[in-house]
């Protein structure tokens, strides 16, 4: 027979680490080539001009320039697209 009360078990007590998703460079910001613009799961924001997409759907800058977001119509829903505009020296 038990001389101490047994402790109950629980199925809780775990949590995953945060993945630090989201926008890393906002509209109008200057970025360099290779810098991360958005970390995302899936393609909620589409890559535009001078923007590449990694295998985990991360968007990154292909050239130096400034960040610009635009809203586009894709099928029946509106989507966002991110572009990098490079300023040409005159």
Swiss-Prot record:
Any one GO molecular function term: structural constituent of ribosome
Classification via Pfam families: Ribosomal_L27
Top-rank taxon, per record: Bacteria
Keyword Ribonucleoprotein: yes
Gene Ontology biological process terms from the UniProt entry: translation
Matches recorded under Gene3D superfamilies: 2.40.50.100
A GO CC term attached to the entry: cytosolic large ribosomal subunit
Keywords assigned: Ribonucleoprotein, Ribosomal protein
Region (Disordered): 1-24
Entry's family note: Belongs to the bacterial ribosomal protein bL27 family.
PANTHER family in UniProt: LARGE RIBOSOMAL SUBUNIT PROTEIN BL27M (PTHR15893:SF0), RIBOSOMAL PROTEIN L27 (PTHR15893)
HAMAP family named among the record's database cross-references: Ribosomal_bL27
Cited NCBIfam families: L27
Protein name as it appears in the record: Large ribosomal subunit protein bL27
């Amino acid at each position: 027979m038990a001389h101490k009360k047994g402790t109950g078990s629980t199925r809780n007590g775990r949590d995953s680490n945060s993945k630090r998703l989201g926008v890393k460079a906002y509209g109008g910001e200057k970025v360099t080539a290779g810098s991360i613009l958005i970390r995302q799961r899936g393609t909620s924001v589409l890559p535009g001009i001078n923007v590449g997409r990694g295998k985990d759907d991360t968007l990154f800058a292909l050239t130096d320039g400034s960040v610009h977001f635009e809203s586009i119509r894709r099928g029946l829903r509106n989507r966002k697209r991110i572009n990098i505009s490079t300023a040409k020296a005159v």
